[in-house]
Amino acid sequence: MPRRRVIGQRKILPDPKFGSELLAKFVNILMVDGKKSTAESIVYNALETLAQRSGKTELEAFEIALDNVRPTVEVKSRRVGGSTYQVPVEVRPVRRNALAMRWIVEAARKRGDKSMALRLANELSDAAENKGAAVKKREDVHRMADANKAFAHYRW
């Protein structure tokens, strides 16, 4: 094992409008081909629409939607003596956020609404109400972990 120093994670700069690191990460996940300003305008328009619908502030509404999509457990493949088991493991907080944001963006991209801002706003409002494709994805992951609870002792 190398004895070099461990490289720390890069610090992500908070987004300019709300000063939230979580929102900056969300913009980065949404961004395509390095077009950050386009991604930011999509996210801000979506949050504005979401805030009007929910009657909460933009960040509160975003946080509620993200909360409903965050997974607590997931399955990881573990090979034991020739057979592979799906072992349920708890998700680390950073990965929890990353998965939730990725699932929301993927679900929004698959929607058939007019603009991406509208698709994202609809997906976020669905997530805030515990419905939609991103929430379904979380339920599926939890169901898989629940079904494979018998292999939890293989955790490492």
Swiss-Prot record:
Listed Gene3D superfamilies: Ribosomal protein S7 domain
UniProt keyword annotations, A-Z: Ribonucleoprotein, Ribosomal protein, RNA-binding, rRNA-binding, tRNA-binding
GO cellular component: small ribosomal subunit
Superkingdom, taxonomy of origin: Bacteria
Molecular function per GO: rRNA binding; structural constituent of ribosome; tRNA binding
A biological-process GO annotation: translation
Keyword Methyltransferase applies: no
Family: Belongs to the universal ribosomal protein uS7 family.
General function of this protein: One of the primary rRNA binding proteins, it binds directly to 16S rRNA where it nucleates assembly of the head domain of the 30S subunit. Is located at the subunit interface close to the decoding center, probably blocks exit of the E-site tRNA.
Cross-referenced HAMAP family: Ribosomal_uS7_B (MF_00480_B)
Quaternary state and interactors: Part of the 30S ribosomal subunit. Contacts proteins S9 and S11.
Protein name: Small ribosomal subunit protein uS7
Organism of this sequence: Proteus mirabilis (strain HI4320)
Species lineage: Bacteria, Pseudomonadati, Pseudomonadota, Gammaproteobacteria, Enterobacterales
